[in-house]
Amino acid sequence: MSDPIKVDIWSDVQCPWCYIGKRKFEAGAAQFGGDVEVEYHSYELAPDTPVDFEGTPLDYLAQHKGISLEQAEQMTQTVTGIAASVGLDYHYEHIHQTNTVKAHELIHYAKAKGRQLDMKERLLKAYFVDGRHVGRIEDLADLAAEIGFDRADVVRSLEANEYLADVKADVAQATEYGIQGVPFFVIDGKYGVSGAQEADTFANVLAQVRDEKAAAQ
């Protein structure tokens, strides 16, 4: 039995393409059919954003990208349509724009307990689908408790910045790799795939890596 193929994914909780890319990658991995080991890494698209951003996601987009509110609305409508095509029901009207550093710390907390993928999925769904706040410690603790974590221990960890160094290390590694946007997939430590590519693309790269590994044995 061959070892699983390692896939490292840089991603942000409030990146709409990261959730879409997650679904497309999952479809590609299923299509590939072999063993794949996924690890998520922190990437902050807007580290200067306050925890409680005053304004709507459209206000944020317009400010951040230097575009009009009409253009921002068009962008969100486009991405909502693409999300729907992979089974995701985005609700931009309910989104709480925030700072995601604590959400990233929580993902590392979950990783230490062997449940990183569950926590990542819950946070993405909370942000884009459920209209939950993913920047405040109390809200994050609620979300963690919903999937079985000890709420008080999550609060303790986040208040102590227990995994902040891990978040910073991920961000530093992204810079070292030259990653300038997410999602970004590093497959088998050597192939980089940028953006929410189609499932076929992921399946093909995974198959290529499997064949290369087999040929090298």
Language-model regions: role of each:
Residues S2-V36, Y40, I107-Q217:
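C-terminal cap of thioredoxin/glutaredoxin-like
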Residues K22-Y127:
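Structural alpha/beta surface segment adjacent to cysteine/selenocysteine redox centers
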